[in-house]
Design a protein with these regions (language model features):
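ABC transporter nucleotide-binding domains
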Residues: 3-4, 11-202, 207-208
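C-terminal coupling/interaction segments
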Residues: 263-310
Length: 310
């Protein structure tokens, strides 16, 4: 069953339409990365799915029902970008309060707080919490009642690298248990191994959607071969030039190493010729990363291949 289906959804306000004509779905047991620059329409799309806004055009179905229906909403967990809590209450008290509001069992509160790494701070007032701790408390609140759909808007904001890795491991566990998860972010480094598909928005339009292999096929960006010479690097360079003659490539030299950017469809015949030459001591192959694909699809330009989006 799909967690949600957007069919040519648009939302217009102040003479702007964001998102516009977006068609997208999320399956149960799937993590979808929703990426785009600030103002691309990520948060508005989430609010449409939550029923906090109404689409101007298109069709929207959430968990087989209508967005905003209380019977649907009780199966959704949501972590907003900026979380705020009553500073005089403890983490345990706040989570118990939200459990009652959602109709979830308060008995799960200690377990959820431990799950997000707040076991030792559950009885401390939240005014003493760091930003990262408040973010983890917000995640625990989103997990109340074992939601079937989990919406996370910039969930790694304020988290250190260890806490971020813990978050991604938890999301994988929830996915394996059947939860559909939307991970909304403009920060790409580190997220690539943890998502099943990526959707890239710019100016409200969906530029691309798919798993990484399909996005790479759509982009048809070059792969990079890093080659270490078994002897004289000049001889290796001559061998590479011979193997790639007539093909569109970019060759770079750094000490005993050569890097070759080449069309992915030309990769195997060139590799076979290079390996047969005996001129290579070592090699590695780098495919376009999620960051590279993001830059390609939004058309930003100016970022070197294998560089990073900030």
């Amino acid at each position: 069953m799909n967690c949600f289906e957007l069919d040519t959804i648009s939302h217009s306000y102040d003479r702007e339409t964001v998102p516009k004509d977006v068609t997208l779905q999320l399956n149960s047991g799937e993590i979808l990365g929703l990426f785009g620059h600030n103002g691309a329409g990520k948060t508005t799309t989430i609010k449409l799915i939550l029923g906090l806004m109404k689409p101007s055009a298109g069709r929207l179905s959430v968990l087989g029902g209508e967005a905003g229906d209380p019977k649907v909403s009780q199966h959704i967990g949501y972590l907003p970008e900026n979380v705020m809590f009553y500073p005089q209450l403890t983490g345990r008290e706040i989570l118990a309060h939200f459990a009652r509001l959602k109709g979830a069992s308060p008995a799960q509160v200690p377990e959820l707080l431990a799950q997000v790494g707040l076991a030792d701070a559950m009885d401390a007032r939240t005014r003493t919490y760091s930003k990262g701790m408040r973010q983890r408390l917000g995640l625990a609140q989103a997990l109340l009642g074992k939601p079937r759909l989990l919406m996370l808007d910039e969930p790694t904001v304020g988290l250190d690298p260890v806490a971020t890795a813990d978050l991604y491991r938890l999301l994988r566990q929830l996915r394996d248990e059947g939860t559909g998860i939307v991970l909304c972010s403009h920060v790409l480094p580190g997220v690539e191994p943890y998502i099943d598909r990526a959707a890239i928005l710019t100016a409200g339009a969906l530029q691309a959607v798919g798993d990484l292999p399909s996005l790479r096929r759509q982009a048809n960006m070059p792969v990079t071969l890093d080659l270490t010479s078994a002897g004289d690097v000049g001889e290796l360079e001559n061998t590479v030039n011979a193997a790639t003659r007539g093909r569109e490539t970019v060759l770079r030299r750094d000490g005993q190493q050569l890097s070759v950017d080449i069309d992915p469809h030309e990769k195997m015949p060139v590799l076979q010729e290079l390996l047969a030459s005996g001129a290579i001591a070592d090699l590695s192959i780098h495919q376009p990363s999620l960051e590279d694909l993001y830059v390609h699809f939004i058309g930003a330009g100016g970022l070197a291949h294998r560089g990073g989006a900030q």
